[in-house]
Amino acid sequence: VQLKEQNASLAGMNVITEPIVSYTSGNLASHVLGYVGPIDEQEYETRKDTYRNDDIIGKSGIQYVFEKYLKGTDGVKQVDMTVDGAITSEYISEEAVSGSDVVLTIDANLQKVAEEALKENIENIAAGKYGEKHDTKAGAVVVMNVHTGEVLAMASYPDYNPERYSEEYSNDDTGKYTNRAISGAYPPGSTFKMAVATAALQEGAITPTSRINDTGVYPYGHHPVCWYYTSYRSGHGYLNVTQALKYSCNYFFYEMGYRLGIDKITDYASRYGLGKRTGIELEGEAQGN
């Protein structure tokens, strides 16, 4: 501070004030926390009443979404000086105000476990440790409290170090800055069976005790097969809806789809939120995720 106060009298020297954001846990929850960077021209034009043109601002993640709460207010300290730079008096004309704290539902320990497990499994799949090798390079994990909907962990791989964002971003071709947990749209897979089961029960296509005989190869359409048939060349046999969900029986739900029709299935899938955004407090959520 004293150097800056005497900046004009010190030839060849310039003092620059630069805010620093420290990420004490490295890459942990990098896609959730996001990164910061210098305010750009467009951002400054819409915020110049409260920002300087050399400010650092949230660019992604929580730091972007809650920027207005996280940003504090700079203080102003005025001093009187003699011609040789000696301070004769000083007083604060404006106190600095710290930004607010933002408390997340993320459990740091669970987040660490999720990230490590995700990375390990992606590497194992690529190496063929679970059977056939696959060109697997990326993935995502979300852990939620089923009673409240709170997100306890959200991992996306590959991840990144927020402190090194600016030097890495322009050279990145891995997509590691994309939060795949919310920005990727993926087929729902067998989780879709819950929507079909609900529709079948609500619309009277079956009762809780109705049983369907899975023979392995479905007789209609293009004759799709149950996963069990692919592995064991037979079907699950007679199953009710609870058992069909337990064993993830494709044949059972092919039959439910045939009985219900596409419109009813689409209606119930929509009620479950499929094809819609969740409204999570992060930017970049893809519709239908």
Protein language model annotation of sequence segments:
Residues 4-5, 26, 30-34, 60, ...:
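Solvent-exposed, polar/charged alpha-helical surfaces in well-ordered, non-transmembrane soluble domains
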Residues 13-15, 124, 277:
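Short, well-structured beta-strand/strand-turn elements
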Residues 38-42, 116-129, 159-160, 228-231:
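Short regulatory "switch" loops immediately downstream of catalytic or recognition motifs
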Residues 70, 118, 122, 249, ...:
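Structural signal for hydrophobic packing residues in well-ordered secondary-structure cores
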